[in-house]
């Protein structure tokens, strides 16, 4: 039985096999389709066209063309594509992850990032090859891993920059360092997925099963900034994206970025970007390729009317 599934044109794909029998499979979501991963499976998604939204235990994320996201096995993500969206993904069982981790320097961690057009094309080609080869015989695991090895190696290569930080993590053994890094990466992703509010250290410590003191110390050592500073930076970047991509009022952007009042938001935004939110939005709109045409049309009409 082929383990490739596709949700297209508004279809909802439910991946809800029991934890003990969670399978490795290739998944695609396109054109208003959606996929719900209820099985206990690590998942990786790459956005190839359009936009998709992801809701998971780590929060809410927007994937644009070229973005990728990797989620832990208990994240239970729901991915929804827009009308032009197309994304491909992999769900990996616990056994598949254990086998993959045996490859030298080949491990996958929770996180998100961006790929070049060339890497995106490679992902699609390798995903298609894996979808053709994955079957579920009685001895499924050796076949599954053999079929997925090329794309998993490629995805691990895309995470090379993230994995370079593993040596900063405390621990005597390589496996312990990887374990700590995996937990901290999930906390970092949790901050990105909750840019609409202030995240407390206690939440992140509970997520990683570390004490608040140990978590804060290790986080700063790994990312060169405190959890509070990282949260503030991500919230400001989130606000900047809202100013560029939406018509929300400044007060609405402030509220959507976790600020109680506009004054504190204005101070934080100016400290981060060196200008006001209004000025930032105006500059972003004027830099768009179609802005000159959009503003030129009414000017010509006014001149023709003689007013």
Question: Which residues are covered by each model-predicted region?
Answer:
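Amphipathic alpha-helical segments enriched in hydrophobic/aromatic residues interleaved with Lys/Arg
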Residues: 2-4, 103-165, 189
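Key DNA-contact positions within bacterial/archaeal DNA-binding proteins
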Residues: 213, 262-263, 278
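Short, Lys/Arg-enriched N-terminal segment that forms or immediately precedes the first helix
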Residues: 166-175, 217-223
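Core residues of bacterial helix-turn-helix
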Residues: 208, 257-258, 269
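Terminal helix-turn-helix DNA-binding modules in bacterial transcription factors
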Residues: 185-193, 197-202, 221-261, 282-307
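Helix-turn-helix
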Residues: 205-212, 216
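Short hydrophobic/aromatic patch on the recognition helix
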Residues: 66, 215, 219, 264-265, ...
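N-terminal regulatory/effector-sensing and dimerization cores
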Residues: 2-113, 140
């Amino acid at each position: 039985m082929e383990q490739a599934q596709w949700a297209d044109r508004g279809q909802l794909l439910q991946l809800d096999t029991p934890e003990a029998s969670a399978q490795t499979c290739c998944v695609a979501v396109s054109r208003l389709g959606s996929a719900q991963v209820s099985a206990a499976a690590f998942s990786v998604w790459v956005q190839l066209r359009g936009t998709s939204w992801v809701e998971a235990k780590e929060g809410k994320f927007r994937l644009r063309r070229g973005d990728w996201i990797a989620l832990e096995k208990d994240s239970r993500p729901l991915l929804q594509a827009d009308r032009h969206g197309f994304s491909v993904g992999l769900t990996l069982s616990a056994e598949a992850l254990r086998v993959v981790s045996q490859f030298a320097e080949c491990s996958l961690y929770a996180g998100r990032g961006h790929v070049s057009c060339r890497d995106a094309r490679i992902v699609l080609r390798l995903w298609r090859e894996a979808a053709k080869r994955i079957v579920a015989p009685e001895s499924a695991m050796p076949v599954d891993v053999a079929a997925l090895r090329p794309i998993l190696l490629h995805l691990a290569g895309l995470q090379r920059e993230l994995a370079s930080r593993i040596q900063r993590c405390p621990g005597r053994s390589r496996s312990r360092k990887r374990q700590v890094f995996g937990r901290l990466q999930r906390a970092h992703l949790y901050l990105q997925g909750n840019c609409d509010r202030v995240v407390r250290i206690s939440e992140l410590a509970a997520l990683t099963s570390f004490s608040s003191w140990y978590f804060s110390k290790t986080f700063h050592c790994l990312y060169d900034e405190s959890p509070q500073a990282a949260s503030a930076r991500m919230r400001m970047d989130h606000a900047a994206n809202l100013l560029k991509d939406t018509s929300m009022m400044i007060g609405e952007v402030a509220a959507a970025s976790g600020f109680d009042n506009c004054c504190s938001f204005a101070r934080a935004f100016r400290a981060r970007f060196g200008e006001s939110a209004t000025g930032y939005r105006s500059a972003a709109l004027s830099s768009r390729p179609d802005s000159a045409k959009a503003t030129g049309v009414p000017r010509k009409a006014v001149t023709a009317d003689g007013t």
